[in-house]
Swiss-Prot record:
The record marks 99 as: Important for activity. NADP(+) binds at residues 198-203. Homodimer. Pathway: Porphyrin-containing compound metabolism; protoporphyrin-IX biosynthesis; 5-aminolevulinate from L-glutamyl-tRNA(Glu): step 1/2; Porphyrin-containing compound metabolism; chlorophyll biosynthesis. It holds the Pfam family GlutR_N. Possesses an unusual extended V-shaped dimeric structure with each monomer consisting of three distinct domains arranged along a curved 'spinal' alpha-helix. The N-terminal catalytic domain specifically recognizes the glutamate moiety of the substrate. The second domain is the NADPH-binding domain, and the third C-terminal domain is responsible for dimerization. Catalyzes the NADPH-dependent reduction of glutamyl-tRNA(Glu) to glutamate 1-semialdehyde (GSA). Substrate binds at residues 49-52, 109, 114-116, 120. One of its GO terms (biological process) is chlorophyll biosynthetic process. InterPro entries: 4pyrrol_synth_GluRdtase, 4pyrrol_synth_GluRdtase_dimer, 4pyrrol_synth_GluRdtase_N, GluRdtase_CS, GluRdtase_dimer_dom_sf, GluRdtase_N_sf, NAD(P)-bd_dom_sf, Shikm_DH/Glu-tRNA_Rdtase. This is Glutamyl-tRNA reductase.
Length: 436
């Protein structure tokens, strides 16, 4: 069996490719069923965020397993394999384990050390368990990866003041406004007319960061206006006007900055809509939705500047130098956890041999005990029988303790395989299995 991960991220694919592979929560169940339908795939889980789509799996054969996963990805995205493959990465065994732990720790994020990815890995684990697509191996890996992410954030300063996608989007707005005014600094948003489209978690984070950057009023649009009103109640110090998404165009006309973060699988704003507005002032769109909420053709409008998640790199690069130094310490913690998991996984090789040895010894114990009890005759009481049975079980457990502990103890795979072969040969475990 092999652990593999196949996917793509902000490091390997632009947003126009990533958005075609974004798997919303409502499609996860169907996608997991499709992947489990492949005979090579034993366990599987999906991580889908705005910056990555990764499929982790336990497969019988790494080559056919990876091919099956790639086939699914190509069919789901509608991108022919030849065009898709250059954007995909594949990690096997130790590299796959290391990758997931680094992802959980925020070491592979666009925004180094961001905290949201940890909750997304937790959700991946929960969805895998709810859909019964994960088993003992992936569950152990996911649990330990989440634990690793928590450990990195508690034992290093990587997460201290870490920016998120949402805060980077707000800083990008500050930077672009400053650049228009001739400054290469982040300026206050106090005088800007801000529109936020969407009322989910990302929008909540957007509003939190907008408030900290000088914004004191904004318009909040959402398809479900009650959800927008509930979100607005959490920010009593801000003047938030809530409206329905059907008022999108007229509210764009009132804005200087528009942030979008909805779950729509199709763009909600395109050039045709913008051209109807007769804009005369500069307008900035910052779209952190994946799939994108704003069509790429909007960039053709003379008064519009449109940015998506890939454009956040300009802001992120300004903050990375300090975090790169802290990341070294975090990487050493991740490596420790990787070794712990691999030692546990390698120890599973011993389980079939241990079980066979225990089964054979238990059979011998019962046979010899029965012979002894039959010689004792009817005068041997039930209580005495129980004492003798407990005695024989204790002897077997004592005999097994040292070899079982040795087989399960941390050692190289080569050493463990030598030990297993010795035990199999000494106790004729292989020959008996073949005869059976």
């Amino acid at each position: 069996m092999h652990i593999v991960v196949v996917g793509l991220s902000h490091r390997t694919a632009p947003v126009e490719v990533r958005e075609k592979l974004s798997i919303p929560d409502q499609s996860i169940t169907e996608s997991l069923k499709a992947l489990k339908a492949f005979s090579d795939v034993l366990e599987v889980s999906i991580l889908s965020t705005c910056n990555r789509m990764e499929i982790y799996a336990l497969v019988k054969d790494k080559n056919t397993g990876i091919s099956s996963i790639k086939e699914f990805i190509s069919e789901y995205s509608g991108i022919i394999f030849e065009d898709l493959n250059p954007h995909l990465f594949c990690f096997r065994q130790e590299e796959a384990v290391l990758h997931l732990m680094k992802v959980s720790a925020g070491l592979d994020s666009l925004v180094l050390g961001e905290g949201q990815i940890l909750s997304q890995v937790k959700k991946m684990m929960r969805l895998g368990q709810e859909n019964q697509s994960t088993g003992p191996i992936l569950n152990r890996l996911l649990t330990q990866s989440v634990s690793t992410g928590k450990k990195v954030r508690s034992e290093t300063n990587l997460g201290t003041g870490a920016v998120s996608i949402s805060s980077a989007a707000v800083e990008l707005a500050q930077l672009k406004i400053g650049q228009e005014k001739g400054f290469d600094t982040l300026v206050s948003l106090e005088s800007e007319n801000v529109l936020v489209v969407g009322a989910g978690r990302m929008s909540r984070l957007l509003i939190t960061h907008l408030k900290s950057k000088g914004c004191h009023k904004l318009i909040l649009l959402n398809r479900n206006i009650d959800r927008a009103l509930n979100l607005a109640q959490d920010f009593p110090d801000l003047e938030i006007v809530c409206r329905g998404l059907n008022e999108l165009e007229e509210n764009i006309s009132l804005s200087s900055i528009v942030f979008t973060s909805t779950a729509s699988e199709e763009p909600i704003i395109d050039l045709a809509k913008i051209e109807k507005l007769n804009l005369s002032n500069r307008l900035k769109f910052i779209d952190i939705g994946v799939p994108r909420n704003i069509s790429n053709d909007v960039k053709q409008h003379q008064f519009v500047k449109s940015f998506d998640v890939d454009d956040l790199q300009e802001v992120v690069s300004r903050n990375q130098e300090f975090r790169q130094k802290i990341a070294k310490e975090a990487e050493s913690l991740v490596e420790e956890e990787r070794i712990i998991f691999l030692e546990w996984w390698a120890s599973l090789e011993a389980v079939p041999v241990i079980n066979k040895l225990r089964s054979d010894l238990e059979l011998i114990r019962k046979e010899e005990l029965q012979k002894a009890l039959s010689r004792m005759g009817p005068d041997f009481s039930a209580r005495e029988r129980k004492v003798v049975e407990a005695l024989t079980k204790g002897i077997i457990n004592k005999i097994l303790h040292t070899p079982v502990t040795k087989l399960r103890s941390p050692q190289s795979r080569e050493e463990r395989q030598v030990s297993l072969k010795i035990v199999e040969k000494l106790f004729s475990l292989v020959e008996e299995e073949q005869n059976n």
